[in-house]
């Protein structure tokens, strides 16, 4: 299931990215690297960030370059200095865990190439409420999202939503795609 989802996610990201092979692909909270594997198999340079040292070791053993660190603007600046900006950044179901959500997003904005694409997957609060999914509310989730608040948060750091996709993960999630340039409506 995760492997199928990772392939679909890969294809959706590539469709939305120009010059995707330039620079590198960054996943925040990359776990064992499952969602970076399709990029690796297709010749992309990838970097995963995950705070769990044991999981980062597994990812590296599976061919996914992974740093065992928490994501924040300090990590972003260090990575930017070493590797330059990322062409693609994605963070799946991790934003709700961030203690300092503004610093987390600031780090993504700092690390994203000027022509890059950011994809953030979050459990959608609308799905939780509509489906009465009270069992989806966890103590480690510090927030839940609808589109407007996440869009406002991204805008504060010069990131602009250009597409949204529904995901069936966790009983209903949204994937928000953003860029540094505001796309004018026609």
Positions of predicted regions on the chain:
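A conserved beta-strand element that flanks and buttresses the S-adenosyl-L-methionine
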Residues: 87-90
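A short glycine-rich, Lys/Arg-flanked "PGG" loop and its adjoining helix->strand segment in the class I
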Residues: 102-117
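Conserved SAM-binding strand-loop segment of SAM-dependent methyltransferases
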Residues: 63-78
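Short, glycine-/aromatic-enriched active-site segment of Class I SAM-dependent methyltransferases
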Residues: 118-143, 147-149
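Conserved S-adenosyl-L-methionine
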Residues: 159-170
């Amino acid at each position: 299931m995760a492997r199928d989802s990772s392939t679909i996610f890969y294809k959706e990201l590539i469709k939305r990215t120009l010059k995707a092979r330039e620079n590198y692909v960054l996943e925040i909270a990359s776990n064992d690297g499952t969602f970076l594997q399709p990029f690796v198999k297709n010749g992309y340079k990838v970097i995963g960030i995950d705070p769990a040292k044991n999981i980062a070791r597994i990812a590296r053993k599976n061919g996914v370059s992974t740093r065992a660190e928490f994501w924040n603007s300090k990590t972003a600046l260090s990575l930017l200095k070493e590797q330059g900006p990322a062409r693609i950044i994605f963070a799946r179901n991790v934003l709700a865990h961030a203690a300092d959500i503004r610093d987390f997003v600031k780090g993504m904005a700092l690390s994203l190439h000027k022509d890059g694409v950011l994809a953030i997957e979050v459990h959608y609060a609308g799905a939780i409420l509509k489906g009465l999914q009270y069992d989806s509310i966890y103590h480690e989730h510090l927030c839940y999202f609808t589109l407007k608040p996440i869009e406002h948060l991204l805008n504060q750091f010069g990131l602009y939503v250009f597409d949204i996709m529904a995901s069936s993960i966790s009983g209903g999630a949204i994937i928000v795609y953003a860029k540094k340039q505001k796309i004018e409506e026609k």
